[in-house]
Structure formats: structure tokens, C-alpha cells
């Protein structure tokens, strides 16, 4: 990571997303999900976004995108292989951009997209690439796509970028508790979300309205599919993920506690030593002796936070947990609503008997 | 004073006849010297006494200089003599103020030294040969010295003294005559000191009597104060020391001529001194010490009062023999009764006797002798009788000493003092006596008999109070104390027959205090005693309501230690009461506050804690003084057993129900500890003590074997140790067995529900020897409380079990919630980082035990308060008691509900 990065505050306020991009992302992620590639490689589907920035409207238009090449699993621990892949990837990306240019499509990179279940996949790597992109162009964003939601009949796309404070810390790659505290960084303000407006072509819009008017399709509106509570699996998954995150949080909190105690002790020690030395020096000055330098005191090693990335992991874990909790909350509340509706419907159809078999989700203790 | 010298002479005379002469001279001289000193020092003796040490210092200083001067003289070093004289004059000047203040005249040795120097200088001056023989320096020093001397004597107006001395000089043979003089001095002042210790007011009394004696011209009288002051062994020993001092000096005198024999003599003389140490002295003193009146004189009120004052003036002095003091007072009382001087005097003297008796032992922490206690008790008793008998005597603390009316027949007698305080103090002494007696000996039982007398005395005092309460002679507080004393002697006693009356009495007494007492302390104590009493007498509901109404549990932490002890006792007794009534949960709550600490005895003040290293000797003493006398003890073993049984009845079903839960919540830590201990043991033999019995019973119950459980709880051994200690043993036993059956059934169902698909109620009823109705009710209750997922099938009389496994999502959610809990805990720790074991205690704090031990560590020496409820556990516990009311309301329905 380069150290000399000038951080310019982004001016973009919202994102205009072409429906083409949406379609492409969905297709890419869904096909991969179906093929189970992401589970094999353990990597998120990702791609590059292209478009242009409208500074006067403080708007970012994303007009096209393309997927990046997946890392092929490295068979041997060949150090060269990874590098080769990286080069290959880079090469393909440039190639694609060149083709875009020749086809008169916007070839300016404005960010990248990734798919994460429940929209919660913020890892250290992601932050690093976000920093890279944002360093490249201050208006760059990341689109997080949630394939699970799509399965449930909804589209979930969210645009994020690192806040200036987080960017600042990332540029130093220093997430020590003191600095984080000084920057006033919490998991809530680490990332900034940008509102997305999906723009379809007029032709598209016409088609949509025609479809909605067409009688043959309208019966679909009232299908019982909407009452499907098939979210048990995903809930389980999200709870599981949450547990993992909480574990992570626990670990980092413990190390933070230890660090605070150590730090306090260290500070006290240094303080008392300095004071003693100062007194001694004063008396030495009075006697006319040379003073003893404070170097050795300064050299006493301050305690280190026992995590790899300082507070970053903790922040990310909190952020993820938050996202997961949001997901669980919405799903459960939706489910409860559905159940009530279902109950009412059922009562109407079969008067008198209440069917509680649906209530499998609600029967949590 | 001369008496001493004569006596000494007597004793010395047999040691060596050769000493007699010297001795005589000395005695004469000192006597003479003393006389004129006495004359000069007369009016302000006491002040001199205060600064004696200072005077001695000055004397030493002067003497040192004189000694130097003498050396210089013998060396004919006039230069040194001159400087020596200067410093002497200076030192004397400085010390003059001291002497003046003490009214000491110019010390004779000083005069003598002056005279000696003067003589010497004059001699030199006159003797031309000697003068010429002097060295140059010395010759130079001689004239100024002479002049200075002359001038000094003139300036200081010492001529008279000098001439006096010249007329009557000291013997020349003395080597160190000034020492002796000083000793005379010291002795005089010392004997003065003996004569007049104590406060100035007493001083005045003595001098009063002195002057009186002068007026009366009665030889008996004049000897009185002296005999008073000197009838003590202390003074004897002091005189003895003085005498030794003298004797030693005598050797020194002797040593001049007879050095060889010196050693022998020393031994001999010393022996002699030791021989006649006490034997010779004491009888003389005793003889003289008795109070007596001049037979010729008529004993009137005034004389009597004077005499009483005189005797009382010796009170509290270090030199006063306390027994003698009491005897003197007794004598006075006799005389006064004989002469019929009236009740006023009698009461006054009696009261003085009582206080003198109390003062027989000097330290407040020591307990009174039992015999003394009994005499005191009798004295107080008779005085009380006397006071009850007549309403003409008013004894009150509100009177000032000047207001006292002892002699005027026509008015009421007014005397300062309070019989109630005496009674109270007597009560305290009894407690101390009992505390210090060996509680397992017959001696204790003997001493305990005094308790009955004490009770009747207190009752009498109460009667007296009620009789005279209108006359306004009592302090409100005093009256409260009397009632309180009665309560404190009654509250722990169980009265079997005519229980109604006893209860009424207690109500009456407590109500008195509730209405009378202004400060809260007595009221609180009375309330606690009341609760205790009610609990002892099985009035559970009243006792509990009273305790809850008093809000004691909220304020007890801020009250004094004695009240806290009483509170602890009350809580325990209440717990036992609840147990007798079958309110297991309440009993458990009540007892766990004390039992969970593992220091029940200490908290009940029935034993002193073993952790000496944390306590200073002082604290230990205080702790000891707080101990509850043995006959008031609550049986700790019984309490522990009851507590464990309660824990068993509550905990075992609970354990069975959450066997698979990840985090078990323990109701009683000490019970779990006991269980674990027995599990750890590689070989479990048959139970020995009560604790092991309960643990064995618990294990049996956990297996659902109620019969075995019952056998462990109710058997001969337990009968002896536990059940027979209840006054209604059979009912309690029946209750416990019944509870064991019920709880065993519950445990059985919870433990083995997985094995059964259906159970017939009849079979269960047979198995646990309960009626089918009871089984039905218990099971229904369990179903309602969602402890058991099952349904009752009426037609077939079966219990149908439902097996519900939690879904995976539910399990996950539970796991997650656990994890979140630890996360929250860790988070708290960040906010409040603490080193060591202490940490966030939020979720764990429903259970007091853990915190308690922490509290101990943190403030081990915090007295009873900190020990009983350390750390933050108290809120939880407080809540327990508070919520008890709610549970209670549910509770009575328990047996009937289903």
C-alpha cells in the first residue's frame, strides 16, 4: 500500500445505476452460485464497475460492468502462481477496458462489485481493495449484492465507500485503539452508504407497464408464493454467521481489555520513571552535573494490541454483526407479518379452526 | 508523716546498732526541715506536685554545678571556681522561677554551697601565704570571685539564710550532704503527693477537712486525712523505696570508716528491708483506715455528709484500695442507719456503695467477680426496694449536685443519680460474666442462675418506673432502656404454657418502646427482638410481616454492629420458623443469608473469627465483648441441617430439570459444594454427621428413591441431633417427609420423562405413597409451570409425555444468546477494567455466595457488616426478601391448589 496518498473527500451524493449493470451482476452471481463455484473457491464473486462521474449533479453513473476472473485454486504452494494470476487478471481487466473503449462504452473504472450473503462480508481484504480503489479515484464505490435476497424475491444492492476518517487510517494501515478513538471511528461511521437509483431505459419502462397490465400475468400477483416462509435455512445461516462474528468480537474485546490494562500499567510506570528522572536531573543541574537523558525510558516498549489489524477486525465484525442482525430482524418481522396474514386468510377459508402449524419460526423461546 | 519515720526506725534498729546514731540525726534533721518546708509550702501543695519532675531536674542541675565547684575548690582552681560560680548563679536564677512557682524556698544545699564557697574564698583572702602561693591565673580570679559572691548574696537577699545556716550549719562529716537534703525534699514532696492526688475539687475537700480538724482541736481528726491517704499498699511500697534509698546512703556514710564490712551490710540491710516489707506495714495501715467518728461528737447530718464527702474524695484515686473504700462506705451506712439520719443519707450512701462496687475492677473490659456481682445485685435490689417503698426520696440524674437534699426532713429528699443506670450496668456486667465463663461447665449454670435474679430485678425496676413515672425524675431514655432490658431478657426464651400471656407481655413491652423511643436504635432493636420472639413462638406470619414492615433489611447495613448481630439472629430464627411451618423457600432464603457465608458462627456472634492476622488485638477484644452469651445461642448445626434440607428440597428438582442446560443456575452454593465434595470422595461410607446425612439423602432423591431419602433424613441419629430440638418435632418431621415425597416425585418425573411415553397416575401414587389426588395436583402444577411437557389424560388416568426437541434454529439462537452474554460481560470489563478476580458481576449476582467471598477478600476486617454482605450481592439478596411477600401470597395455596 502506498504511503503517500492524498485523500480527497468524495463529492458524489448518489448513484445512478443502469439496469443493465443490475442484470449483469445478478446473472453473474446467480450463475456462479448455482454452479457452486463460490463455495469451492471460497471467494466472493466480483467484478469491475465502469461509468462516469457527474460532478455538477454530484452523481455517479454506473453504466456497465464486467466480472473479473476468478482465482483458480493454486495446487502447489507455488509462489509464482499467485503472482502470475494477478498479472493475468490485471491483463484481462485492461483488455476488457480497451474493448469497452473501442465499443464506445464508458471505460472509466468507478468501483467494483462483490456478492456477499446477507450483505455482510466486510473483510480486511475488502477494506484494502476499497482503499485501493478510492485512492485511485475518490468517487469510487463498492456495490454489495446479496444473492440470498434475490432468491427470496427481492433485490438487494447497496453501495458503500470508506468514510474519510477510515480512509485516513487505512492509508497509514494503522488501526491502533488510540488512533481509532481519536478519529472517532465506530462501526456505524466507518462506511458510508450511498443511495442508489436504478435507471431503466424508456423501452424497458414501457415493457414493464405493459406486462403489469397484461391479464395473463396478473394472477401471479396473488400467488401464495409470497406467503412462503422458506427463510429458515437462511436464518440459521445468518445466526451461524453472527455467532462467528460474535466470537471474533469476544476475542478482540478480550485482547483489548488486556491491552487497556497493560497500557495503563505501562503509562503509570513511564510516568513515575520520568518524574523520578526529572527530579534527579534537577538535582544534578543544581550540583552542576550533566543530566541523564530520558532515552532509556522512552525506549521501554509500549504494549501491543494482540490482534493483527488493531481495531479493524473488531470494527468489521461489529459491522457484519449489525448487518446480519438487520437481516434477521427484517426476515423475522416479515415472517411474523406473513403468518398473521396467513392466519387471517386461513380463517376466512376454513372458519373456526386455527392452524398453528405454520408457526414454526415463531416458536422460539 | 512522722509515723513513717518512727516505724522505719523501729525496723532499722534491729539491723545494726551502729547505724542508729546517724539514722536518728538524719531523721531529726529531715523532720525539722520538712516542718519548715511544710509551713512554707502549705497553701499550694497541689501545684507543686504537678511540676515536680521539673524541680528535680533543676535540682540535679544545680547539684552538678556544686559538685564541680567543690572539685575546683579542692584543686584550688579558682578560675574554674569562678566560672562555676557564675554558672551556678545563672542556673539558680533560671530555676528560681520554677522554685517560686512551686513555692520551694531557696534550697538549703544551695545556701550551703554558697556558704562553703564564701568561706573558702574568705579564708584564702585572709590567708596571705596561701594567696601568694596561688598561681597567677588563680590569683587573678580570686578578687572578682569574692566580690561577686558578696554582691550576689546581697543582691539576692540571701544574707538571712546564710546567717541562718551559719548559726545552724550542717555537720561537716557529710561527704555529700546536699544529696541528702534533696532526698528529704523529694520525700516531702512525694508524701505530699500521696496525700493529695486526684482532682482539685477533692483536694479542696481534703484541705477543708484539714482546717476543720484544726478548729476542732481533735487529734483523731487531724490524723484522719493522712491515714486515709496512706492506708494503701502502694504508698507503703513507695515509702519502702524511699527507705531503701536512705539505707543505701547510709552505707555510703559508713563506707568512710568501714569499707570492708560494707558488702555484708548491704546484704543484711537489704534482707532486713525485705523481711519487714509487708508484714510490718499492712496491719498498721488497716488499723488506722477504718472510718470512725469521734465518740464525743454527736453524729449529725452535716458531719455525716462531710464524712461521706471525705470518703468519696478518695474514690477513683490510684492509691485508694477499692475494697477498703467499699468497706468504709458500708461502715458509714451502718452508722447512719444506727443514728437514724434519714432515708436521704441512706440512699445516698447506698448509691455510693453501688458505684464503688462497680468500680472494683479498674478496667471496663474486665468482667466483675461473680461474688461482687451478687453483692452488687443485692445492694441494688435493696435500694430499689427502699425506693419503691417510699416516695419521699427522689433519685434522678436531672438534679445537680448542689440541689441535693439529704438532710431536710420536711422536704422530699433529692439525690443525684440513677438507679436505672445502675441496673443497666449490672445487666451489662452479667453479660460480661457469662461471656467469660466456660459455657460447658457447671460453673456457667451456676452463674446463669443470677440471670433469673437479674430478671426479677429488672422487673422490679420496671415496676418502680411505672410507679414513679409521673414524678418526672426519669429520663425518657432511661425508661426505654429498662423496657429494652426486659425485652432482651425475654425475647429468646420459649414459653410453652400460657403462651398467650407471654406474647401479650412482649407486645406490651415492645409497644412501650415503639411509643417512647425517639431515637431509632432502641426501636429497631425492640422490633427485631419482637420478630425473634414471634418466630420462636411459631407466629410466622406476624413475625414476617413485622420484619417486612420494619424495613430492617434496608437499613441494617447502616446500623451498629450489635443491631446487625441481632438482625442476623432474627433472620435465622425466622428461617427456622418458616421451616417449621413448611415454607421451604422462605426458610431457605432466610437461612442462606447467614449460611452461605461459611461463617455463620461469627455472624451470629457465637464465636470469634479465626482470622487473627487481619485483626488487631483491639478489634479482637471488641469482637469478644460482642459475643452472645452461650445460653442465647442459636444451634448452628441445626441451622445448617435445616438449611441443607431446604436446599435439597429446592435444588434437587431444579437440578433434574436443567440437567441439559449449558449454564446451571445454582440456588445454593454451599449445598452444591457439599454435593461435589461427596462426589469427589473415592469411597462414600455411611453418613456420619448431619451434613453427610443430608447429602446422602440428596443423592437418593436425585435418583428418585424417596424412601432411602426419607431414611437418611429421619432416623435416630437425626432425631437426636435435629428433630428433637424442635418443640413440635413430630409435625415438622411429618412435613419434611411429605415434602420429600413430593419433591422426589417431581425429580422422578423430570429425570425419567424421556424414558416414559405414558405413566399411569396410580402407579406414581403407589410408588411415592401419595394419594392420587396429590399426584394429580403436583403434575398439573408442573405442566402449568412448563417444567414438564406432558398432558394428563383423564379417561385413562395417564400422563402422556410430549417430546419436544428444540429446533436447530432454536438451539443456535440459544447458543448465540449465550455468546452475546459473554460479550456483554467482556464489554463491561472494558468500561471498568479491574485486575484480579473481581469483574463484572451482573449476571452472576443473583447468587450471593460468590460475591460474598470476594467481599471478604476485599474488606476482611470490615466488621460484621462487610462480612455479612460483601460486595454487590446484597442488592440481590435484599430483593429476595422483598419479593418474599409476593411468593408468600402464593404459597399458602400450595397444598390446596390442585
UniProtKB/Swiss-Prot annotation, chain A:
Q: Which UniProt keywords are present, listed alphabetically?
A: Cytoplasm, Initiation factor, Protein biosynthesis
Keyword Protein biosynthesis present in the record's keywords: the answer is yes
Q: Which GO terms describe its biological process?
A: formation of cytoplasmic translation initiation complex; translational initiation
Q: Which CDD domains match?
A: MPN_eIF3h
Instruction: Give GO terms: molecular function aspect only.
Output: metallopeptidase activity; translation initiation factor activity
Q: Which InterPro entries match?
A: eIF3h, eIF3h_C, JAMM/MPN+_dom, JAMM_MPN+_peptidase_M67A, MPN
Q: Where's the MPN domain? A: 15-166
Question: Where does this one sit in the cell?
Answer: Cytoplasm
Gene Ontology cellular-component annotations: eukaryotic 43S preinitiation complex; eukaryotic 48S preinitiation complex; eukaryotic translation initiation factor 3 complex
The organism's place on the tree of life at top rank? Eukaryota
**Could you give the subunit structure recorded for this chain?**
Component of the eukaryotic translation initiation factor 3 (eIF-3) complex.
Q: What does this protein's UniProt record list under function?
A: Component of the eukaryotic translation initiation factor 3 (eIF-3) complex, which is involved in protein synthesis of a specialized repertoire of mRNAs and, together with other initiation factors, stimulates binding of mRNA and methionyl-tRNAi to the 40S ribosome. The eIF-3 complex specifically targets and initiates translation of a subset of mRNAs involved in cell proliferation.
Family classification: Belongs to the eIF-3 subunit H family.
What is the protein name given in its UniProt record? Eukaryotic translation initiation factor 3 subunit H
- Organism of derivation: Caenorhabditis elegans
Swiss-Prot record, chain B:
UniProt-listed GO biological process terms: formation of cytoplasmic translation initiation complex; translational initiation
Q: Which portions of the chain have biased composition (kind: Basic residues)? A: 888-898
Residues of the region (Disordered) are 1-38, 162-238, 829-898
- Name the domain of life: Eukaryota
Record GO terms (molecular function): RNA binding; translation initiation factor activity; translation initiation factor binding
Q: Name one Pfam family in it.
A: PCI
SUPFAM superfamilies assigned to the protein according to its UniProt record, in alphabetical order: Winged helix' DNA-binding domain
Q: Name one GO cellular component term.
A: eukaryotic 48S preinitiation complex
Subcellular localization is given as: Cytoplasm
UniProt feature, compositional bias: Basic and acidic residues? 1-10, 24-37, 189-202, 850-859, 866-878
Keywords (A to Z) from UniProt: Cytoplasm, Initiation factor, Protein biosynthesis
Against Gene3D superfamilies, the record matches this protein to: 1.25.40.570
Q: What is its main location?
A: cytoplasm
What interactions and quaternary structure are annotated?
Answer: Component of the eukaryotic translation initiation factor 3 (eIF-3) complex.
Task: Give the protein's biological function.
Answer: Component of the eukaryotic translation initiation factor 3 (eIF-3) complex, which is involved in protein synthesis of a specialized repertoire of mRNAs and, together with other initiation factors, stimulates binding of mRNA and methionyl-tRNAi to the 40S ribosome. The eIF-3 complex specifically targets and initiates translation of a subset of mRNAs involved in cell proliferation.
Which family does the record claim for this protein? Belongs to the eIF-3 subunit C family.
The protein here is known as Eukaryotic translation initiation factor 3 subunit C
List the source organism.
Answer: Caenorhabditis elegans
Taxonomic lineage from the root: Eukaryota, Metazoa, Ecdysozoa, Nematoda, Chromadorea
Amino acid at each position: 500500500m502506498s504511503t503517500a496518498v492524498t485523500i480527497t473527500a468524495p463529492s458524489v451524493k448518489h448513484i445512478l445505476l443502469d439496469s443493465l449493470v443490475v442484470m449483469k451482476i445478478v446473472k453473474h452471481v446467480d450463475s456462479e452460485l448455482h454452479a457452486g463455484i463460490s463455495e469451492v473457491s471460497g471467494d466472493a464473486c466480483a467484478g469491475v464497475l465502469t461509468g462516469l462521474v457527474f460532478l455538477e449533479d454530484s452523481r455517479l453513473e454506473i453504466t456497465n460492468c464486467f466480472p473479473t476472473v476468478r482465482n483458480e485454486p493454486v495446487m502447489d504452494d507455488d509462489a509464482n502462481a499467485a503472482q502470475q494470476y494477478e498479472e493475468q487478471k490485471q491483463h484481462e481487466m485492461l483488455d476488457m477496458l480497451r474493448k469497452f473503449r473501442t465499443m464506445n462504452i464508458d471505460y472509466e473504472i468507478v468501483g467494483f462489485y462483490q456478492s456477499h450473503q446477507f450483505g455482510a462480508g466486510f473483510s480486511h481484504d475488502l477494506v484494502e481493495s476499497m482503499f485501493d480503489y478510492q485512492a485511485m479515484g475518490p468517487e469510487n464505490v463498492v456495490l454489495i449484492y446479496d444473492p440470498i435476497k434475490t432468491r427470496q424475491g427481492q433485490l438487494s444492492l447497496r453501495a458503500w465507500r470508506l468514510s474519510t476518517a477510515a480512509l485516513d487510517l487505512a492509508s497509514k494501515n494503522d488501526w491502533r485503539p488510540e488512533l481509532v478513538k481519536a478519529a472517532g471511528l465506530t462501526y456505524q461511521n466507518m462506511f458510508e452508504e450511498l443511495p442508489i437509483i436504478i435507471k431503466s431505459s424508456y423501452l424497458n419502462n414501457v415493457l414493464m407497464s405493459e406486462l403489469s397490465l397484461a391479464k395473463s400475468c396478473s394472477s401471479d400477483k396473488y400467488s401464495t408464493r409470497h406467503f412462503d416462509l422458506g427463510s429458515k435455512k437462511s436464518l440459521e445461516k445468518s445466526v451461524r454467521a453472527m455467532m462467528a462474528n460474535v466470537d471474533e468480537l469476544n476475542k478482540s474485546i478480550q485482547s483489548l481489555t488486556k491491552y487497556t490494562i497493560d497500557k495503563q500499567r505501562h503509562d503509570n510506570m513511564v510516568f513515575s520513571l520520568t518524574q523520578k528522572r526529572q527530579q534527579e536531573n534537577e538535582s544534578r543541574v543544581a550540583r552542576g552535573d550533566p543530566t541523564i537523558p530520558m532515552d532509556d525510558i522512552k525506549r521501554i516498549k509500549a504494549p501491543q494490541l494482540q490482534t493483527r489489524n488493531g481495531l479493524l477486525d473488531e470494527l468489521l465484525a461489529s459491522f457484519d454483526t449489525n448487518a446480519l442482525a438487520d437481516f434477521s430482524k427484517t426476515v423475522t418481522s416479515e415472517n411474523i407479518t406473513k403468518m398473521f396474514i396467513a392466519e387471517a386468510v386461513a380463517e376466512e377459508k376454513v372458519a373456526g379452526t386455527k392452524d398453528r402449524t405454520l408457526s414454526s419460526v415463531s416458536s422460539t423461546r | 508523716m512522722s509515723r513513717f519515720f518512727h516505724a522505719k526506725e523501729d525496723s532499722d534498729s534491729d539491723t545494726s546498732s551502729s547505724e542508729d546514731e546517724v539514722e536518728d540525726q538524719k531523721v531529726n534533721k529531715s523532720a525539722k526541715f520538712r516542718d519548715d518546708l511544710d509551713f512554707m509550702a502549705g497553701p499550694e501543695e497541689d501545684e507543686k506536685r504537678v511540676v515536680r519532675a521539673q524541680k528535680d531536674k533543676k535540682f540535679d542541675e544545680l547539684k552538678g554545678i556544686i559538685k564541680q565547684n567543690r572539685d575546683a575548690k579542692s584543686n584550688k582552681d579558682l578560675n574554674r571556681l569562678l566560672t562555676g560560680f557564675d554558672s551556678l548563679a545563672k542556673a539558680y536564677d533560671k530555676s528560681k522561677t520554677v522554685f517560686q512557682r512551686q513555692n520551694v524556698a531557696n534550697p538549703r544545699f544551695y545556701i550551703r554551697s554558697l556558704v562553703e564557697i564564701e568561706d573558702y574564698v574568705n579564708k584564702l583572702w585572709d590567708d596571705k601565704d596561701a594567696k601568694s602561693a596561688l598561681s597567677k591565673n588563680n590569683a587573678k580570679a580570686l578578687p572578682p570571685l569574692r566580690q561577686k559572691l558578696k554582691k550576689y548574696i546581697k543582691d539576692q537577699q540571701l544574707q538571712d539564710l546564710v546567717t541562718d545556716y551559719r548559726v545552724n550549719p550542717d555537720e561537716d562529716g557529710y561527704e555529700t550532704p546536699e544529696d541528702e537534703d534533696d532526698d528529704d525534699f523529694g520525700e516531702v514532696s512525694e508524701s505530699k503527693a500521696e496525700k493529695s492526688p486526684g482532682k482539685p475539687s477533692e483536694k479542696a475537700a481534703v484541705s477543708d477537712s484539714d482546717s476543720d480538724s484544726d478548729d476542732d482541736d481533735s487529734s483523731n481528726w487531724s490524723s484522719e486525712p493522712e491515714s486515709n491517704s496512706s492506708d494503701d499498699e502502694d504508698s507503703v511500697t513507695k515509702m519502702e523505696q524511699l527507705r531503701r534509698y536512705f539505707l543505701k546512703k547510709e552505707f555510703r556514710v559508713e563506707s568512710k570508716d568501714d569499707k570492708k564490712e560494707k558488702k555484708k551490710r548491704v546484704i543484711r540491710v537489704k534482707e532486713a528491708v525485705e523481711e519487714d516489707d509487708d508484714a510490718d506495714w499492712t496491719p498498721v495501715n488497716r488499723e488506722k483506715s477504718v472510718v470512725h467518728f469521734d465518740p464525743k461528737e454527736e453524729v449529725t447530718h452535716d458531719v455525716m455528709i462531710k464524712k461521706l464527702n471525705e470518703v468519696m474524695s478518695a474514690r477513683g484515686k490510684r492509691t485508694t484500695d477499692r475494697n477498703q473504700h467499699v468497706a468504709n462506705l458500708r461502715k458509714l451506712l451502718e452508722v447512719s442507719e444506727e443514728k437514724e439520719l434519714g432515708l436521704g443519707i441512706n440512699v445516698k450512701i447506698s448509691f455510693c456503695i453501688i458505684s464503688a462496687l462497680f468500680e472494683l475492677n479498674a478496667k471496663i473490659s474486665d468482667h466483675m467477680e461473680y461474688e461482687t456481682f451478687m453483692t452488687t445485685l443485692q445492694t441494688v435490689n435493696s435500694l430499689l426496694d427502699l425506693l419503691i417503698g417510699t416516695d419521699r426520696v427522689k433519685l434522678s440524674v436531672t438534679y445537680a449536685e448542689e440541689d441535693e437534699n439529704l438532710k431536710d426532713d420536711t422536704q422530699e429528699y433529692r439525690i443525684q443519680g440513677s438507679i436505672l443506670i445502675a441496673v443497666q450496668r449490672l445487666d451489662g456486667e452479667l453479660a460480661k460474666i457469662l461471656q467469660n465463663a466456660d459455657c460447658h461447665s457447671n460453673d456457667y449454670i451456676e452463674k446463669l442462675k443470677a440471670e433469673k435474679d437479674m430478671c426479677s430485678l429488672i422487673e422490679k425496676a420496671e415496676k418502680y418506673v411505672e410507679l414513679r413515672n409521673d414524678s418526672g425524675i426519669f429520663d425518657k431514655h432511661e425508661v426505654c432502656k429498662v423496657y429494652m432490658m426486659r425485652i432482651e431478657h425475654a425475647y429468646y426464651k420459649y414459653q410453652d404454657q400460657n403462651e398467650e400471656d407471654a406474647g401479650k407481655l412482649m407486645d406490651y413491652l415492645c409497644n412501650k418502646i415503639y411509643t417512647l423511643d425517639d431515637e431509632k436504635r432502641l426501636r429497631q432493636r425492640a422490633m427485631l427482638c419482637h420478630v425473634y420472639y414471634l418466630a420462636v413462638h411459631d407466629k410466622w406470619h406476624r413475625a414476617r410481616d413485622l420484619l417486612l414492615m420494619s424495613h430492617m433489611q434496608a437499613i441494617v447495613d447502616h446500623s451498629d454492629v450489635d443491631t446487625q448481630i441481632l438482625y442476623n439472629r432474627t433472620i435465622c430464627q425466622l428461617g427456622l420458623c418458616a421451616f417449621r411451618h413448611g415454607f421451604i423457600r422462605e426458610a431457605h432464603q432466610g437461612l442462606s443469608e447467614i449460611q452461605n457465608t461459611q461463617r455463620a458462627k461469627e455472624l451470629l456472634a457465637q464465636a470469634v473469627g479465626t482470622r487473627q492476622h487481619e485483626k488487631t488485638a483491639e478489634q479482637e477484644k471488641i469482637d469478644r465483648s460482642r459475643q452472645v452469651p452461650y445460653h442465647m445461642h442459636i444451634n448452628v448445626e441445626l441451622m445448617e441441617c435445616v438449611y441443607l434440607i431446604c436446599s435439597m428440597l429446592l435444588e434437587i428438582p431444579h437440578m433434574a430439570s436443567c440437567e441439559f442446560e449449558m449454564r446451571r443456575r445454582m440456588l445454593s452454593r454451599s449445598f452444591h459444594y457439599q454435593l461435589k465434595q461427596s462426589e469427589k470422595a473415592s469411597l462414600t461410607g455411611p453418613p456420619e454427621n448431619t451434613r453427610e446425612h443430608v447429602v446422602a439423602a440428596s443423592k437418593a432423591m436425585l435418583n428418585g428413591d424417596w424412601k432411602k431419602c426419607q431414611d437418611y433424613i429421619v432416623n435416630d441419629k437425626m432425631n437426636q441431633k435435629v428433630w428433637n430440638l424442635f418443640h413440635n418435632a413430630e409435625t415438622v418431621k411429618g412435613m419434611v417427609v411429605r415434602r420429600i415425597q413430593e419433591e422426589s416425585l417431581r425429580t422422578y418425573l423430570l429425570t425419567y420423562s424421556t424414558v416414559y411415553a405414558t405413566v399411569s397416575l396410580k402407579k406414581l401414587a403407589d410408588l411415592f405413597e401419595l394419594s392420587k389426588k396429590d399426584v394429580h395436583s403436583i403434575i398439573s402444577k408442573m405442566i402449568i409451570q412448563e417444567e414438564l411437557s406432558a398432558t394428563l389424560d383423564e379417561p385413562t388416568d395417564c400422563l402422556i409425555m410430549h417430546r419436544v426437541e428444540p429446533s436447530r434454529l432454536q438451539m443456535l439462537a440459544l447458543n448465540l444468546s449465550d455468546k452475546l452474554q459473554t460479550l456483554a460481560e467482556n464489554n463491561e470489563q472494558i468500561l471498568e477494567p479491574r485486575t484480579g478476580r473481581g469483574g463484572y458481576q451482573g449476571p452472576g449476582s443473583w447468587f450471593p455466595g460468590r460475591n460474598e467471598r470476594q467481599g471478604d477478600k476485599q474488606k476482611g476486617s470490615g466488621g460484621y457488616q462487610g462480612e455479612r454482605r460483601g460486595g454487590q450481592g446484597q442488592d440481590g439478596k435484599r430483593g429476595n426478601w422483598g419479593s418474599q411477600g409476593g411468593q408468600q401470597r402464593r404459597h399458602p395455596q400450595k397444598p390446596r391448589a390442585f
